[in-house]
Amino acid sequence: MKELAMAALAAGGVCAADATGAFLPLTKGWDKTFPQSDKVEHAKVTFRNRFGITLAADVYKPVGSRVPRDRHPAIAVSGPFGAVKEQSSGLYAQTLAERGFLTIAFDPSFTGESGGTPRYVASPDINTEDFQAAVDYLISRDDVDVDKIGILGICGWGGLAINAAAVDTRVKATVASTMYDMTRVTANGYFDKEDSAAARQAKKEAMNAQRIKDFKSGTYELGGGVVDPLPADAPQFVKDYYAYYKTPRGYHARSLNSNGGWNKTSALSFINAKLLAYAGEIENAVMVLHGEKAHSRYFGEDAFKMLKGENKELVIVPGASHCDLYDGGGKGAIPFDRIEAFYRKNLK
């Protein structure tokens, strides 16, 4: 456990070494976009993935838990794509801990407080591994029931969670909330409007030209986060992203979407991949959760069609947009009762 969990601290600061020997300075105190619950104990931890990258995470567990008497069902949470653990994933994790689960919300490789260079890059392989490394960490804890582990991915991490569930048989239950299939949207554009060889060729040429530029400059140019200033004619879902990432509601200084965004060549890893290729082989339970009015709803519904078995659920939240399922949208849109019931049923 000492090798996997590099450091933990309930309050104050902590440093942990990544694979390069550099130290990760973790923040002191509470810096989330949501209030701290008095029903939950919180601690900072770090652990390494299979690629040697050190990930930073927040652990949440019910107040009053005692080891070894209390071994909790556990859930690893991450997302949205381009967010940090202080945003939506932390809210999900803390809320589920209030309901009796031990949870972790982690920053993916190359982002937030986690290690890895270059910064602000995504990878379908490494980011799937991030979920699996979180499972490794949970299994190492004395207060976790190792046969009752689930994962929860939000937005682009919903698709990655399904991919992780397809390869990691230790994951007994998976929730994909307001999910994106990042490989599909990268290759085909929104609503599959760029689903042609010519369109993909143009994207590849642009990204490879950027590779040359980055190599020569020795830096990685960022693509920009959520558009700012917001154009008056922006699509509603872009306005919704702005309302979350660019306002006090969800802004965080370490969030890519709130600031400079991913590096421009990051999409190269996704454009030729098929993230959900083996979704139909997942034997354990999966819930796909989406808002009725979400622009991304088609990702979730199409993913659900790939799943097989009686232990798969599709939940459409009436009136909810994509971003309403980040933090409830001020109207309690996240169906935590339904999520809890799903995990209770399947983590047993």
Please name every model-derived segment.
Residues D143-C155:
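Alpha/beta-hydrolase fold nucleophile elbow
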Residues F23-D70:
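N-terminal cap/lid segment of alpha/beta-hydrolase-fold proteins
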Residues R71, G82-Q94, P108, G300:
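The serine-hydrolase catalytic nucleophile loop
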Residues T95-G115:
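Conserved alpha/beta-hydrolase
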Residues A320-A333:
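Catalytic histidine-centered segment of alpha/beta-hydrolase-like enzymes
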Residues I282, V288-H290:
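Short beta-strand/loop motif that positions the catalytic acidic residue
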Residues V121-D142:
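Alpha/beta-hydrolase active-site loop
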Residues I162-T247:
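Alpha/beta-hydrolase-fold enzymes
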